[in-house]
Amino acid sequence: MHPRRPDGFDGLGYRGGARDEQGFGGAFPARSFSTGSDLGHWVTTPPDIPGSRNLHWGEKSPPYGVPTTSTPYEGPTEEPFSSGGGGSVQGQSSEQLNRFAGFGIGLASLFTENVLAHPCIVLRRQCQVNYHAQHYHLTPFTVINIMYSFNKTQGPRALWKGMGSTFIVQGVTLGAEGIISEFTPLPREVLHKWSPKQIGEHLLLKSLTYVVAMPFYSASLIETVQSEIIRDNTGILECVKEGIGRVIGMGVPHSKRLLPLLSLIFPTVLHGVLHYIISSVIQKFVLLILKRKTYNSHLAESTSPVQSMLDAYFPELIANFAASLCSDVILYPLETVLHRLHIQGTRTIIDNTDLGYEVLPINTQYEGMRDCINTIRQEEGVFGFYKGFGAVIIQYTLHAAVLQITKIIYSTLLQNNI
């Protein structure tokens, strides 16, 4: 119940250097910038990407080329312009490559987390809500086998269903957070000089955001676990329609076992806030370690331009990866309980994750969060909370592989252009 991408990575929105304002060249006198501080008044960084993993609690990326002295673990910075004519051309070429690399790295990260990982998310959720299952799929080997069976019997759509609704949930979450923060004094970001009151208000904003997005998250969950065998061809906005219908009590008829939204608020907000806190702490901790390691390596020996550019992007990507992995693993049992509560009473038909074919109904009768936890522990054991965990292993293995491949491609491009 959280944006898959926490706030902070502004790779897609990175701008370096100056822009050519040709349309206004004749109306205003030319300005000369003698120092990096003069340039800082005119060259600014754009806002962070909505939905990105900015878990720095108020940190913003500095303008390109402007040295930063507040962080002791940063490496040496480069001046944006050179005095010589040939150096200026080379600097512009390096700047264009740097901007292209930032866009490519950000795009690869977005693609991995929201597209490439979606089949793993689909199977993981189906295993979590399947209380009938005898095979828990705790290892990636059984998960790959069942993925192949689903693809063979139902086609590729069986593993990519509901992807559009996940983007809608992210959009609703971001929009709700922005609107609430605009009309209330609740801070959207926490500054370095924080106070307990500011932290509490920030977490309250997150909680209200999760409450607003909760019915749409429930509708998206149904789309991702509903069997493709009996699935109708629904539009991309079906998630919005079902979410609104869930709030006003209209739409698809549900059974009497459907839990009211009020009883789902606590587990939904608990999972979302804990996921955000764990991700924030781990991301901050890992990023601090990586920056300190980079700073020490710069002091020990001279660093190549290729390594310097890699150090500008990849520490934050690695920190985001570690934060997302740890929070998903730690909160996996709570996520299983949350999904079972959301799916109960919706008359959803899921695929049989034991056989790879046939379908199964969801007929649980949990009275609430505590009853769900006790029932899973008694009937399925402790490992019942970890059904489908092998899909998480596959998901983050793919993510790590894409990060490594992106780093290799980026290093090759830099070596050929420097």
Swiss-Prot record:
<comment type="similarity">
    <text>Belongs to the mitochondrial carrier (TC 2.A.29) family.</text>
</comment>
<keyword id="KW-0813">Transport</keyword>
<feature type="transmembrane region" description="Helical; Name=2">
    <location>
        <begin position="167"/>
        <end position="187"/>
    </location>
</feature>
<dbReference type="GO" id="GO:0048936">
    <property type="term" value="P:peripheral nervous system neuron axonogenesis"/>
</dbReference>
<feature type="modified residue" description="Phosphoserine">
    <location>
        <position position="32"/>
    </location>
</feature>
<dbReference type="GO" id="GO:0051649">
    <property type="term" value="P:establishment of localization in cell"/>
</dbReference>
<feature type="transmembrane region" description="Helical; Name=3">
    <location>
        <begin position="202"/>
        <end position="222"/>
    </location>
</feature>
<dbReference type="GO" id="GO:0021702">
    <property type="term" value="P:cerebellar Purkinje cell differentiation"/>
</dbReference>
<dbReference type="GO" id="GO:0065003">
    <property type="term" value="P:protein-containing complex assembly"/>
</dbReference>
<keyword id="KW-1000">Mitochondrion outer membrane</keyword>
<dbReference type="GO" id="GO:0055091">
    <property type="term" value="P:phospholipid homeostasis"/>
</dbReference>
<dbReference type="GO" id="GO:0008535">
    <property type="term" value="P:respiratory chain complex IV assembly"/>
</dbReference>
<keyword id="KW-0496">Mitochondrion</keyword>
<feature type="region of interest" description="Disordered">
    <location>
        <begin position="44"/>
        <end position="93"/>
    </location>
</feature>
<dbReference type="GO" id="GO:0031987">
    <property type="term" value="P:locomotion involved in locomotory behavior"/>
</dbReference>
<dbReference type="GO" id="GO:0061564">
    <property type="term" value="P:axon development"/>
</dbReference>
<dbReference type="GO" id="GO:0005741">
    <property type="term" value="C:mitochondrial outer membrane"/>
</dbReference>
<comment type="subunit">
    <text>Associates with the mitochondrial contact site and cristae organizing system (MICOS) complex. May associate with the endoplasmic reticulum membrane protein complex (EMC).</text>
</comment>
<dbReference type="GO" id="GO:0000422">
    <property type="term" value="P:autophagy of mitochondrion"/>
</dbReference>
<dbReference type="GO" id="GO:0007416">
    <property type="term" value="P:synapse assembly"/>
</dbReference>
<feature type="modified residue" description="Phosphothreonine">
    <location>
        <position position="45"/>
    </location>
</feature>
<feature type="transmembrane region" description="Helical; Name=4">
    <location>
        <begin position="258"/>
        <end position="278"/>
    </location>
</feature>
<comment type="function">
    <text>Transmembrane protein of the mitochondrial outer membrane that controls mitochondrial organization. May regulate the assembly of the MICOS (mitochondrial contact site and cristae organizing system) complex which is essential to the biogenesis and dynamics of mitochondrial cristae, the inwards folds of the inner mitochondrial membrane. Through its interaction with the EMC (endoplasmic reticulum membrane protein complex), could regulate mitochondrial lipid homeostasis and thereby mitochondrial fission.</text>
</comment>
<feature type="repeat" description="Solcar 1">
    <location>
        <begin position="96"/>
        <end position="187"/>
    </location>
</feature>
<feature type="transmembrane region" description="Helical; Name=1">
    <location>
        <begin position="103"/>
        <end position="123"/>
    </location>
</feature>
<keyword id="KW-0225">Disease variant</keyword>
<dbReference type="GO" id="GO:0090149">
    <property type="term" value="P:mitochondrial membrane fission"/>
</dbReference>
<keyword id="KW-0523">Neurodegeneration</keyword>
<keyword id="KW-0677">Repeat</keyword>
<dbReference type="GO" id="GO:0000266">
    <property type="term" value="P:mitochondrial fission"/>
</dbReference>
<keyword id="KW-1133">Transmembrane helix</keyword>
<dbReference type="InterPro" id="IPR018108">
    <property type="entry name" value="Mitochondrial_sb/sol_carrier"/>
</dbReference>
<dbReference type="GO" id="GO:0006839">
    <property type="term" value="P:mitochondrial transport"/>
</dbReference>
<dbReference type="GO" id="GO:0021554">
    <property type="term" value="P:optic nerve development"/>
</dbReference>
<dbReference type="InterPro" id="IPR023395">
    <property type="entry name" value="Mt_carrier_dom_sf"/>
</dbReference>
<dbReference type="GO" id="GO:0016358">
    <property type="term" value="P:dendrite development"/>
</dbReference>
<dbReference type="GO" id="GO:0022011">
    <property type="term" value="P:myelination in peripheral nervous system"/>
</dbReference>
<dbReference type="GO" id="GO:0005739">
    <property type="term" value="C:mitochondrion"/>
</dbReference>
<dbReference type="GO" id="GO:0042407">
    <property type="term" value="P:cristae formation"/>
</dbReference>
<keyword id="KW-0144">Charcot-Marie-Tooth disease</keyword>
<feature type="transmembrane region" description="Helical; Name=5">
    <location>
        <begin position="314"/>
        <end position="334"/>
    </location>
</feature>
<feature type="transmembrane region" description="Helical; Name=6">
    <location>
        <begin position="382"/>
        <end position="402"/>
    </location>
</feature>
